[in-house]
Amino acid sequence: MDIKIILMLIIGYLLGSIPSGVWIGKIFYNKDIRNYGSGNMGTTNTFRVLGKKAGIVVLLMDMLKGTITACLPFIFHVNVSVLLIGLSAILGHVFPIFAGFRGGKAVATSVGVLLVYNPLFFTIAWAIFIITLYISSMVSVASMLGFTLVSIISLFFNDRVLTIVAIVLTVFVFARHWKNIERIKNGTENMVPFGLGYRRRQKNTK
């Protein structure tokens, strides 16, 4: 394997390992978000525990980890798929060396990689996520359904690598959301405070 590819994979993993939510929480709020809410260090739990501003910052930072990593092949002038290099950042986000290998669910970082690989596909994926989130008011549902639909839509792009990576990530996202799936079945899944699902739950509790 080319030494540059190895170097890119290492850099990508280290970038992905940056625990944005943990660092933002500790530095600015004196909180380790892994001890609150769902215990996850990702964007959703950051919104829930630290608020909107911190959540947006962590979302952008987590996406940026994937975006920067996906740009490495262009920076190093190496002809290798940005998706494959981007996977190293996703792996780092899920198993971060800087946070005891307790990471997030890789949704934002995956989207960041997709932005570089195919902006059109990124736009489609983002639109699916937003629409699904508005309907369900559940980030978990939007993530799982979004990745599923993205995998199906990727078939129409005639890009084998994209389809394979999309399917692998979909399976992985479902595996990382198994606790959420149980809560969805029990009707106890956390909701964001907007959208049709949230309004329906609020109406039923009155």
UniProtKB/Swiss-Prot annotation:
It is found in: Cell membrane. It comes from the Bacteria. The chain crosses the membrane at residues 5-25, 56-76, 81-101, 111-131, 161-181. SMART domains: G3P_acyltransf (SM01207). The keyword Transmembrane helix applies. Its EC number is 2.3.1.275. Keywords: Cell membrane, Lipid biosynthesis, Lipid metabolism, Membrane, Phospholipid biosynthesis, Phospholipid metabolism, Transferase, Transmembrane, Transmembrane helix. HAMAP family: PlsY. Belongs to the PlsY family. Catalyzes the transfer of an acyl group from acyl-phosphate (acyl-PO(4)) to glycerol-3-phosphate (G3P) to form lysophosphatidic acid (LPA). This enzyme utilizes acyl-phosphate as fatty acyl donor, but not acyl-CoA or acyl-ACP. This is Glycerol-3-phosphate acyltransferase. It comes from Ligilactobacillus salivarius (strain UCC118) (Lactobacillus salivarius). The gene is plsY.
